[in-house]
Amino acid sequence: MRILGLDVGTKTVGVAISDEMGWTAQGLETIKINEERGHFGFDRISELVKQYNVDKIVVGLPKNMNGTIGPRGEACQQFAENLRELLQLDVVMWDERLSTMAAERLLISADVSRKKRKQVIDKMAAVVILQGFLDRK
């Protein structure tokens, strides 16, 4: 059973995939989106679901530090609901607080340049989100 992890931003969606045993997450790609034009990357996500035989999707839910859900969190919830309807798959929301900061720290500790970090940060945040989900199931 493979699980897809998504870090949904305003301009990109970071994508990670689990191994078949559901133990580890690895980064796949970053999908460019344009919310204003209604381009959310659903076609590419659908392709990845088919390609990797995905059974479940985990979408990062950006909560405020006090646990409340703001406008960005509401947008992610709507994104997840649209995916659920489109793909007819189990879509789970996962608290992603500080996932981007954790990904940034991982990349800095690996001595990745600032330019390269900017290119892969969303994909790495998706890895952090998915690995957190896998570790707790």
Swiss-Prot record:
The keyword DNA repair does not apply. It holds the Pfam family RuvX. Its EC number is 3.1.-.-. Its main location: cytoplasm. It is found in: Cytoplasm. Keywords: Cytoplasm, Hydrolase, Nuclease, Ribosome biogenesis. One of its GO terms (molecular function) is nuclease activity. GO terms for biological process: rRNA 5'-end processing. CDD domains: YqgF. InterPro entries: RNaseH-like_sf, YqgF, YqgF/RNaseH-like_dom, YqgF/RNaseH-like_dom_sf. GO terms for cellular component: cytoplasm. Belongs to the YqgF nuclease family. Could be a nuclease involved in processing of the 5'-end of pre-16S rRNA. HAMAP family: Nuclease_YqgF. This is Putative pre-16S rRNA nuclease. It comes from Bacillus cereus (strain ATCC 14579 / DSM 31 / CCUG 7414 / JCM 2152 / NBRC 15305 / NCIMB 9373 / NCTC 2599 / NRRL B-3711).
